Design a protein with these regions (language model features):
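N-terminal hydrophobic targeting signals that begin at the initiator methionine
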Residues: 1-2
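A structural signal for multi-pass alpha-helical bundles of membrane permease subunits
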Residues: 5-6, 10-278
């Protein structure tokens, strides 16, 4: 009796492809980390492993003038911006998902249209408004304040998730005497935690990695720089300490990697369930 080796070969092929893809994405980070532990001279060579492990590079980066200020600014931008986005987007998404009112479809179309609008289209008018009219140039407030008025992508993602919550739960809460606000706070929000977590992570990662925004509004004030923009200061006009640049990059990447590692279950669940019902 001849054995069928096709399932075994398929299993080997799939796992080999998965391992190859994993190595393709992981190896650049390994190279980044190893380079961060090299001396300044060795970082310019083709060596892959440090001759001496220069852990002091991280201390040098940490004590770089302004680095802690960039950390504080980034936490303010990402943390406060994420909080404002969630607070402002949840009520709008709830109304679009669970209320029946005239103009609901038009409102949803406007949200989708806002998602399709390239950010570069509004850069000049937004800069003229925040920097010239309100004189907020040199600060991060032109990036934080707009988040208090909702984000189209966050509203759409939350709306899709809230559609998966059965209306019977809301009807039961209303029968028990709950108003819409109490229903939202006591019934909807606890059930919408995965969707809210996904939106919060998307917004936090966007703000943490944002380079374009701080470059426009805060480039002339080093005290308002964020980590992503502050990394540019490690590049010299004639010489760049690549070991310190790589060490700074690791310190910038580490918080978001750790955050995603601990929140990935809620993130994946929230993103998956947003596509269940339309």
């Amino acid at each position: 009796m001849r054995r069928n080796y096709k399932p075994v070969l398929h299993w080997i092929g799939v796992h080999a492809l998965g391992v190859a893809a994993a190595l393709f994405f992981v190896l650049p980070f390994v190279f980044l980390f190893l380079t961060s532990l090299m001396s300044d001279q060795q970082a310019l060579t083709r060596d892959l492993v440090p001759d001496t492990w220069e852990w002091g590079n991280y201390a040098k980066v940490w004590h770089t003038p302004g680095f802690l200020t960039w950390w504080r600014n980034t936490l303010l931008y990402a943390g406060l911006g994420t909080l404002l986005t969630v607070i402002s987007s949840v009520p709008v998404a709830y109304a679009l998902a669970k209320f029946r009112f005239r103009g609901r479809r038009l409102a949803l179309l406007l949200v989708i249209a806002a998602m399709m609008l390239p950010p570069q289209v509004v850069v000049i008018p937004m800069y003229l408004f925040w920097a010239k009219q309100l004189d907020l140039s040199g600060t991060l407030w032109p990036l934080i304040i707009p988040m208090a008025f909702g984000d189209a992508f966050s509203i759409f993602l939350l709306r899709q998730f809230l559609l998966t919550i059965p209306d019977e739960y809301l009807d039961a809460a209303r029968v028990d005497g709950c108003g819409e606000l109490r229903t939202l706070l006591r019934v909807v929000l606890p059930m919408a935690k995965p969707g809210i977590a996904a939106v919060a992570l998307f917004q936090f990662f966007y703000a943490w990695n944002d380079y374009f925004g701080p470059q426009i509004y805060a480039s002339d004030n080093p005290a308002a720089w964020t980590l992503s923009y502050g990394l540019e200061s490690f590049k010299g006009a004639h010489h760049t300490n690549w070991n310190l640049t790589m060490a700074a990059t690791v310190l910038v990447m580490a918080p978001v990697i750790v955050l995603f590692f601990f929140a990935q279950r809620a993130f994946v669940e929230g993103v998956t369930l947003t596509g269940v019902k339309g």
